[in-house]
């Protein structure tokens, strides 16, 4: 049996301020730092270990992973970073307060932008100061690859490309893997692993910094999955439902 651990980064500063974040490189809040430490303690108490780790190129996911591995005394574990594990790009919504955006565009429209599978928010323009294609971390992206906005389907496409090319072969070779990433990135991966419909993923919530364990067969088909706490598996009815993309 193969085990995979997924973890959404701890609360970020913009989660705290209720702002759309996307690809903006926002750090963890004090609460987020504490959440990451607790996640590491949970994994250590439950006797987990890892051979390799994956994360995005955004500091909130990277720092969460660093803290988790530090708490587990696993700072030697190789870490692979990829923009393909970044959060969904929220286009022109990035940096905006969610409540103020709902007042401007209507709650229904904002709900569609946030939760639908195939509807993109308004796009950034290339002259927008929030356009980050010149950032050195994205220098390997080809022309047209850097998104101006994304729907969940767009996010899923790049996440699964990286899953199939990089992560799946490592898992099949028997390595223990942890992925520290983002709400919509993990939603995309869970949608694929559990073969969820578009309707099914709409209501899928990923809580911050609580380890999500997938037990997989040799073909990486899920046997079962569960969240972890200090006391072991979290009962289904006690899984936190909060979410903030």
From Swiss-Prot:
Tell me which PANTHER family the record gives: PHOSPHOGLYCERATE MUTASE
Q: What is the lineage of its organism?
A: Bacteria, Bacillati, Bacillota, Bacilli, Bacillales
Q: InterPro entries under this entry?
A: His_Pase_superF_clade-1, His_PPase_superfam, PG/BPGM_mutase_AS, Phosphogly_mut1
Entry-linked SUPFAM superfamilies: Phosphoglycerate mutase-like
Known EC number(s)? 5.4.2.11
User: Which family does the similarity line name?
Assistant: Belongs to the phosphoglycerate mutase family. BPG-dependent PGAM subfamily.
Q: Which UniProt keywords apply?
A: Gluconeogenesis, Glycolysis, Isomerase
Q: What reactions does this protein catalyze?
A: (2R)-2-phosphoglycerate = (2R)-3-phosphoglycerate
Q: What does this protein do?
A: Catalyzes the interconversion of 2-phosphoglycerate and 3-phosphoglycerate.
Per its UniProt record, what Gene3D superfamilies does this chain match? Answer: Phosphoglycerate mutase-like
Q: Which Pfam families match?
A: His_Phos_1 (PF00300)
What species is this protein from?
Answer: Bacillus cereus (strain G9842)
Q: What does the record list as GO biological process?
A: gluconeogenesis; glycolytic process
Disulfide partners: none
Main EC class the enzyme belongs to: isomerase
UniProt: substrate binding residues: 8-15, 21-22, 60, 87-90, 98, 114-115, 183-184
User: GO MF annotations for this entry?
Assistant: phosphoglycerate mutase activity
Pathway in which this enzyme or protein is active: Carbohydrate degradation; glycolysis; pyruvate from D-glyceraldehyde 3-phosphate: step 3/5
Keyword Isomerase on entry: yes
At which residues is there a site annotated Transition state stabilizer? 182
Protein name stated in the entry: 2,3-bisphosphoglycerate-dependent phosphoglycerate mutase
Keyword Nucleotide-binding (UniProt): no
Tell me the active site: 9, 87
